[in-house]
């Protein structure tokens, strides 16, 4: 017996070089990244945002510091701080905003993604 599993199709690979600003990296996010990079004492670091399978809605966001930039990475600079996104992740993030928020419940990086059809209550998982 053969079982077929249907996976959601990814949006077409974007030509992000033709877009003026494929996603928004806010001043608040850049300021927090700068602070964290200074704590690491490594000026070569950039914040990498990526999408991976998982979470309760199918996909989840990931953040990490990275010294390495691939040739096909999108590199956005805000106030001297670099945000890196690989092409596969970018197709799910076009038009999104990467921000940093502080509230009584805590502080965190957030992604406001217009491509997400549903999001998890935690805010780190979504579906397309």
From Swiss-Prot:
The entry's keywords: Iron, Iron-sulfur, Metal-binding
Pfam families on file: Fe-S_biosyn
UniProt keyword annotation of Metal-binding present: yes
PROSITE patterns (alphabetical): HESB (PS01152)
One of the GO biological process terms: iron-sulfur cluster assembly
Molecular function terms, GO-annotated: 2 iron, 2 sulfur cluster binding; 4 iron, 4 sulfur cluster binding; iron ion binding
GO cellular component, one term: cytosol
Highest taxon above the source species: Bacteria
Binding site for iron-sulfur cluster: 56, 120, 122
Co-factor binding comment: Binds 1 iron-sulfur cluster per subunit.
InterPro entries on file: FeS_biogenesis, FeS_cluster_insertion, FeS_cluster_insertion_CS, FeS_cluster_insertion_RrpA, HesB-like_dom_sf
Cofactor(s) needed for function: iron-sulfur cluster
Presence of the UniProt keyword Transport in the record: no
PANTHER family for the chain: IRON-SULFUR CLUSTER ASSEMBLY 2 HOMOLOG, MITOCHONDRIAL
Membership in a protein family: Belongs to the HesB/IscA family.
Known function: Required for insertion of 4Fe-4S clusters for at least IspG.
Subunit note: Homodimer.
Entries under NCBIfam families matching the protein: iron-sulfur cluster assembly accessory protein, PRK13623.1
Protein name: Iron-sulfur cluster insertion protein ErpA
Species in which this protein is naturally found: Xylella fastidiosa (strain Temecula1 / ATCC 700964)
Organism classification: Bacteria, Pseudomonadati, Pseudomonadota, Gammaproteobacteria, Lysobacterales
Gene: erpA
């Amino acid at each position: 017996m053969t079982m077929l599993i249907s996976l959601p199709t990814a949006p077409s690979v974007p030509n992000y070089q033709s877009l003026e600003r494929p996603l928004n990296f806010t001043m608040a996010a850049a300021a927090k990244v700068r602070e964290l990079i200074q704590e690491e004492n490594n000026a070569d670091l950039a914040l990498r945002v990526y999408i991976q399978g998982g979470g309760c809605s199918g996909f989840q966001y990931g953040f990490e510091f990275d010294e390495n930039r691939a040739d096909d990475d999108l590199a956005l600079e805000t106030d001297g701080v670099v945000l890196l996104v690989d092409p596969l992740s970018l197709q799910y993030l076009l038009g999104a905003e990467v921000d940093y928020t502080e509230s009584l419940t805590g502080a965190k990086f957030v992604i406001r993604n217009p491509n997400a059809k549903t999001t998890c209550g935690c805010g780190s998982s979504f579906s397309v």
